[in-house]
């Protein structure tokens, strides 16, 4: 740790010894000297210097590790800087040539012929993978029944043969989707690293339409770009899959394919068929072109469940193509509601007096950042939605909404949902045919039969505007944890 003490300024650093730019150091020094000279007390954390450049990969072939560092500048009385002083990323180089000595083997071999264990005896060492700590250099003495630990392995060594993790500073770390080791970053359902499932839509439907005769029936188009595809049914019928070139991938031409993994549209399709009537298709995606899902009908269709995630910009073309082809695809139904036949027009007797409802009392004022932050951070879902209509049911108001944009979700949302609000005079009152930003909670009954989205009384629901959109995006960054 090096220290620079001109005029009560302290330079704290750890690890690497690269020097930041001289001009930048001079500015930081003058700023600190001015603050100290004026008697300004230092508070809060210190300031990080910019990251230095990434080092070269620790390996010349295969996988290795690259590192970059930064330093914390702080005055007396300031807290340490928040965050890490070092970042490690995985670097992937061309595969090592056949016959190359593995990295761990090479490290053990460095101790061949050298006296160890306080004696003059020497041994030939090979890696030993049965020790508890994978990131220690545990080497077995050839021809003997013992191993010895020579400390930590070098950074970039594989934790174990075939493992995805690599050792860094004695710890086994895996790379997140951002390439940084130990970051824990994951792809969301849309394929975005660290995303919030807000750049795609979840399509989930049940296909029940089919004729009475045996043969192939169209179920759905699985469009290009679809991810996390799952299809399932329970019957003696068989799922069939056709590529964009008109050739069958699975169960075509009245021939049932064996269970297994098939290549289709740039992804692996896993086809399983139990000894019972259940049959499933699963694919991670994304698909590189359209696929046509069909069913080879042999008995009445009890229902085929299918789901996938689709980029938002592809959803409208998908709907248009399905409707243009005349395929009987049902629209997404709101959560927890079975499809109902259209209601017959209500007949109102002539001269029936209509009683005006009692006026609703004014709603409490819910403006302000604190209210927005409270409901955003404590909600299960935050989205932009258009109110299609509302209905009073028992002591609740039910809004039917169409989801436009999702800011936060803890489980998939459908294109259309029902949002419930307590009372016949909910606060806030939502007007039909308007777009709102709203924060709602998910309520599931203990037996799982009821699954509702609840807009609490005096909760967060405000007309959508560009300004409110900016405020809610800023609020998302301020939630704890």
UniProtKB/Swiss-Prot annotation:
SUPFAM superfamilies: TIMP-like (SSF50242), TSP-1 type 1 repeat (SSF82895)
Family matches, as PROSITE patterns: NTR, TSP1
Name this protein carries in UniProt: ADAMTS-like protein 5
GO BP terms, alphabetized: extracellular matrix organization
Comp. bias (Low complexity): 345-355
Subcellular location: Secreted; Secreted, Extracellular space, Extracellular matrix
UniProt xrefs under InterPro entries: ADAMTS/ADAMTS-like (IPR013273), ADAMTS_ADAMTS-like (IPR050439), ADAMTS_CR_3 (IPR045371), ADAMTS_spacer1 (IPR010294), Netrin_domain (IPR001134), Netrin_module_non-TIMP (IPR018933), TIMP-like_OB-fold (IPR008993), TSP1_rpt (IPR000884)
Lineage: Eukaryota, Metazoa, Chordata, Craniata, Vertebrata
Quaternary data: Interacts with heparin, FBN1 and FBN2.
PANTHER family noted in UniProt: ADAMTS A DISINTEGRIN AND METALLOPROTEASE WITH THROMBOSPONDIN MOTIFS PROTEASE (PTHR13723), ADAMTS-LIKE PROTEIN 5 (PTHR13723:SF173)
Organism of origin: Homo sapiens (Human)
Chain segments carrying region Disordered: 331-361
């Amino acid at each position: 740790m090096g220290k620079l003490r001109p005029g009560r300024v302290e330079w704290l650093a750890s690890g690497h010894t690269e020097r930041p730019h001289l001009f930048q150091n001079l500015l930081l020094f003058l700023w600190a000297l001015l603050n100290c000279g004026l008697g300004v007390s230092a508070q809060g954390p210190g300031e990080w210097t910019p990251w230095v450049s990434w080092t070269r990969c620790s390996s010349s072939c295969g996988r290795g590790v690259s590192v970059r560092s930064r330093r914390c500048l702080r005055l007396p009385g300031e807290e340490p800087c928040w965050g890490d002083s070092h970042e490690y990323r995985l670097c992937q180089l061309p595969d090592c040539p056949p016959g190359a000595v593995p990295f761990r083997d090479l490290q053990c071999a460095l101790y061949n012929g050298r006296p160890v264990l306080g004696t003059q005896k020497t041994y030939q060492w090979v890696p030993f993978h049965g020790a508890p700590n994978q990131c220690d250099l545990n080497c077995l003495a050839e021809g003997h029944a013992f191993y010895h630990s020579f400390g930590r392995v070098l950074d970039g060594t594989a934790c174990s043969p075939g493992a995805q993790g690599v050792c860094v500073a004695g710890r086994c770390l895996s790379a997140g989707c951002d390439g940084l080791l130990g970051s824990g970053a994951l792809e969301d359902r849309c394929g975005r690293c660290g995303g919030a499932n807000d750049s795609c839509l979840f399509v989930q439907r049940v296909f029940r339409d089919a004729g009475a005769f045996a043969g192939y029936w169209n179920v759905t188009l699985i469009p290009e770009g679809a991810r996390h595809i799952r299809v399932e049914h329970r019957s003696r019928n068989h799922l069939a899959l056709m590529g964009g070139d008109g050739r069958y991938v699975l169960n075509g031409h009245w021939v049932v394919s064996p269970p297994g993994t098939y290549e289709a549209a740039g992804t692996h399709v896993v086809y399983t068929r139990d000894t019972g009537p259940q049959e499933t298709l699963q694919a991670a995606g994304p698909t590189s072109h359209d696929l046509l899902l069909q069913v080879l009908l042999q008995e009445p269709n009890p229902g085929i469940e299918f789901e996938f995630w689709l980029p938002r910009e592809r959803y409208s073309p998908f709907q248009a193509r399905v409707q243009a082809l005349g395929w009987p695809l049902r629209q997404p139904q709101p959560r927890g509601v079975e499809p109902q036949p259209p209601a017959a027009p209500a007949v109102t007797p002539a001269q029936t007096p209509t009683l005006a409802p009692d006026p609703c009392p004014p709603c409490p004022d819910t403006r302000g950042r604190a209210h927005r932050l409270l409901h955003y951070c404590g909600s299960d879902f935050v989205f932009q939605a258009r109110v299609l209509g509302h209905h009073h049911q028992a002591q609740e108001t039910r809004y039917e909404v169409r989801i436009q944009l999702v800011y936060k979700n803890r489980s998939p949302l459908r294109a259309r949902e029902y949002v419930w609000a307590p009372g016949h005079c909910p606060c806030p009152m939502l007007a039909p045919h308007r777009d709102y930003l709203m924060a709602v909670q998910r309520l599931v009954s203990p037996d799982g039969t009821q699954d509702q989205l609840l807009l609490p009384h005096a909760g967060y629901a405000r007309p959508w505007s560009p300004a409110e959109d900016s405020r809610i995006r800023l609020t998302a960054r301020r939630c704890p944890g």
